[in-house]
Amino acid sequence: MDSQGRKVVVCDNGTGFVKCGYAGSNFPEHIFPALVGRPIIRSTAKVGNIEIKDLMVGDEASELRSMLEVNYPMENGIVRNWDDMKHLWDYTFGPEKLNINSRDCKILLTEPPMNPTKNREKIIEVMFETYQFTGVYIAIQAVLTLYAQGLLTGVVVDSGDGVTHICPVYEGFSLPHLTRRLDIAGRDITRYLIKLLLLRGYAFNHSADFETVRMMKENLCYVGYNIEQEQKLALETTVLVESYTLPDGRVIKVGGERFEAPEALFQPHLINVEGVGVAELLFNTIQAADIDTRAEFYKHIVLSGGSTMYPGLPSRLERELKQLYLERVLKGDVDKLSKFKIRIEDPPRRKHMVFLGGAVLADIMKDKDNFWLTREEYQEKGVRVLEKLGVTVR
């Protein structure tokens, strides 16, 4: 709470999950799927102890997703369906989750890098007009990740459910001209795993199965350090084969798919996406930065988001970066490679790094009035109030 006893809320709206809670906390109060569902056919009024309503949100919608038509209001980190987004916020602030009176609270929201201005204007409008928060702040996710790590300068590789961003931050400011986006993230890897399992003869086709495969992915998948070696092991031995029990009790065996699915992050062509993979994109981003800042960036690469949780990802990233640096910068001169310093930070709580950084920032700033966009300022200036955040509003 701030000095006037008002709650300070932090809400990280991801494509796949909402993480929300309070300033100063070490963990989100609630984490739930960012989805809205409507019944396909209205037959039974109850399933187990969950009542089927015309509109189901979050956890409830996730549990009954086989009976619902589900929509994710956000796509690739950007709001696409504002009506459903409002339902999601109603659920977040309402009795089901935070149970707050938004008129007496401040809120810190997060946004992806390169968020369109129109999107940001609409968020501000909804927060002040619909929910009437006393103060609002919108922070860029990559900057919050670095705050959570105690840094002001570094490159954030943020890979969530809907989008992967590579975002350099210098002295606490994100550098939009250097920010790169890769439209491959958790959801695409889950889809690819479904396809690979289909080739093995296991059919998963329903949206309820999607959740099952997502959990399987989180439990079994890893990133191969040396892909040729992994493929050899998968072909010639059974060391990679793991059994996995599905919710209905069936047991399936998963082998090479365990590393083949996340490989899409490094080789986008596997899922028919044009462009370079995450390692080369990271290399290109740092090399495009000012020459004086490159060494700092290479030493402060911070992983963030659920799709960076695969075992083996940090070491593979480091290996590929060194290889690219050797080929393209040192022109193959191995002796000079020892001077090339690189450090990839993979904090254990990186799944919720953005929320943690937001909770730190909101706590430090809770009583600094000039930090927040206030309701009075909004009533006076409308969306032009965003200029206070250093955003040019047309």
Swiss-Prot record:
- List where the protein spans the membrane: none
| Pfam families per UniProt | Actin
GO BP term (any one): primitive erythrocyte differentiation
Which residues hold ATP? 160-162, 214-218, 305-310
Picking any one GO molecular function of the record gives: ATP binding
Q: Which UniProt keywords apply?
A: Actin-binding, ATP-binding, Cell projection, Cytoplasm, Cytoskeleton, Nucleotide-binding, Nucleus
Subcellular location(s) per record: Cytoplasm, Cytoskeleton; Cell projection; Nucleus
Gene Ontology cellular-component terms for this entry are:
Arp2/3 protein complex; cell cortex; cell projection; cytoplasm; nucleus; site of double-strand break
Q: Which domain of life is it from?
A: Eukaryota
Q: Show the CDD domains listed in the entry.
A: ASKHA_NBD_Arp2
Q: What is its main location?
A: cytoplasm
Subunit structure comment from the entry: Component of the Arp2/3 complex composed of actr2/arp2, actr3/arp3, arpc1b, arpc2, arpc3, arpc4 and arpc5.
**Which family is it part of?**
Belongs to the actin family. ARP2 subfamily.
Q: What is this protein's function per UniProt?
A: ATP-binding component of the Arp2/3 complex, a multiprotein complex that mediates actin polymerization upon stimulation by nucleation-promoting factor (NPF). The Arp2/3 complex mediates the formation of branched actin networks in the cytoplasm, providing the force for cell motility. Seems to contact the pointed end of the daughter actin filament. In addition to its role in the cytoplasmic cytoskeleton, the Arp2/3 complex also promotes actin polymerization in the nucleus, thereby regulating gene transcription and repair of damaged DNA.
Q: What is this protein called?
A: Actin-related protein 2-B
Per the UniProt record, the source organism is Danio rerio (Zebrafish)
Gene name, please? actr2b
